[in-house]
């Protein structure tokens, strides 16, 4: 089910790190695999800006609770992408009800977001000599975003390599995992300590709700992001209980 987590001491990684469940799990995956890992976040006027605070808390907790990973965890970077709110007026960047659109996509879809994220990550990685990009894109439990599809990511990898004239690898460890399997991967990587950290400190809720605590973490409990996280948690817990 999961890829082998052998360390690769020859390559350096840059993780697209929002502070959410998926990117936190991807960060742990990269820290287990690579000798040097840096993180990159984006401030694009997102409605759930609390995730920017969550990023720092997760990084702090990782350093404090996982000393081996702390030795491999390098600099954190944050880029201002306020222009995305101007280009794509969506429920992710404005106070409006989350709903499906006529094109079959939810209005939380920010056009070109992941394409821009990966382009900027590759440019930063080029300067920092980080030739592996790690992202939490996923085709299994996702909202239909076209820039999360495996074909999109593979195409972007080729384009970035050609445009930069160097080898670029985009790793997507969650691409074929559902949310229950993402919880399972976190447990496999860091045990209960990492699972607890994801619950307490990562942020997923599109509405930025941090006042309501659930078994699976904080959030409104109703938005699409919360629903995926909640359902994945319940399926993982049920599966673990059945295995016992």
Curated annotation (Swiss-Prot):
<dbReference type="GO" id="GO:0008616">
    <property type="term" value="P:queuosine biosynthetic process"/>
</dbReference>
<comment type="similarity">
    <text>Belongs to the QueC family.</text>
</comment>
<comment type="function">
    <text>Catalyzes the ATP-dependent conversion of 7-carboxy-7-deazaguanine (CDG) to 7-cyano-7-deazaguanine (preQ(0)).</text>
</comment>
<feature type="binding site">
    <location>
        <position position="223"/>
    </location>
    <ligand>
        <name>Zn(2+)</name>
    </ligand>
</feature>
<keyword id="KW-0067">ATP-binding</keyword>
<feature type="binding site">
    <location>
        <position position="226"/>
    </location>
    <ligand>
        <name>Zn(2+)</name>
    </ligand>
</feature>
<keyword id="KW-0862">Zinc</keyword>
<keyword id="KW-0436">Ligase</keyword>
<dbReference type="GO" id="GO:0008270">
    <property type="term" value="F:zinc ion binding"/>
</dbReference>
<keyword id="KW-0547">Nucleotide-binding</keyword>
<dbReference type="InterPro" id="IPR018317">
    <property type="entry name" value="QueC"/>
</dbReference>
<dbReference type="GO" id="GO:0016879">
    <property type="term" value="F:ligase activity, forming carbon-nitrogen bonds"/>
</dbReference>
<dbReference type="Pfam" id="PF06508">
    <property type="entry name" value="QueC"/>
</dbReference>
<dbReference type="InterPro" id="IPR014729">
    <property type="entry name" value="Rossmann-like_a/b/a_fold"/>
</dbReference>
<feature type="binding site">
    <location>
        <position position="205"/>
    </location>
    <ligand>
        <name>Zn(2+)</name>
    </ligand>
</feature>
<feature type="binding site">
    <location>
        <begin position="17"/>
        <end position="27"/>
    </location>
    <ligand>
        <name>ATP</name>
    </ligand>
</feature>
<protein>
    <recommendedName>
        <fullName>7-cyano-7-deazaguanine synthase</fullName>
        <ecNumber>6.3.4.20</ecNumber>
    </recommendedName>
</protein>
<keyword id="KW-0479">Metal-binding</keyword>
<dbReference type="GO" id="GO:0005524">
    <property type="term" value="F:ATP binding"/>
</dbReference>
<comment type="pathway">
    <text>Purine metabolism; 7-cyano-7-deazaguanine biosynthesis.</text>
</comment>
<keyword id="KW-0671">Queuosine biosynthesis</keyword>
<feature type="binding site">
    <location>
        <position position="220"/>
    </location>
    <ligand>
        <name>Zn(2+)</name>
    </ligand>
</feature>
């Amino acid at each position: 089910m999961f890829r082998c987590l052998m360390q690769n001491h020859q390559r350096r990684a840059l993780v697209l790190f929002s502070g959410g469940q998926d990117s936190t799990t991807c960060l742990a995956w990269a820290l287990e695999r690579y000798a040097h890992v840096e993180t990159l976040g984006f401030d694009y006027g997102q409605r759930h800006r609390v995730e920017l605070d969550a990023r720092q808390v997760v990084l702090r907790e990782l350093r404090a609770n996982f000393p081996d990973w702390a030795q491999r965890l390098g600099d954190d970077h944050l880029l201002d992408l306020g222009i995305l709110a101007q280009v794509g007026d969506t429920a992710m960047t404005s106070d409006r009800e989350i709903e499906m659109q006529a094109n079959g996509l939810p209005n939380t879809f920010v056009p070109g977001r992941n394409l821009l994220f990966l382009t900027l990550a590759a440019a930063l990685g080029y300067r920092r000599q980080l030739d592996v990009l790690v992202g939490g894109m996923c085709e299994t439990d996702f909202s239909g975003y076209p820039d999360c599809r495996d074909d999109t990511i593979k195409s972007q990898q080729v384009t970035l390599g050609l445009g930069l004239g160097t080898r670029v690898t985009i790793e997507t460890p969650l691409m074929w995992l559902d949310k229950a399997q993402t919880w399972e991967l976190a447990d496999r990587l860091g045990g209960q300590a990492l699972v607890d950290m994801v619950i307490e400190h990562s942020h997923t809720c599109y509405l930025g709700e941090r006042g309501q605590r659930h078994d699976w973490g904080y959030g409104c409990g109703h938005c699409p992001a919360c629903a995926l996280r909640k359902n994945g948690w319940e399926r993982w817990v049920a599966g673990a209980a059945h295995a016992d």
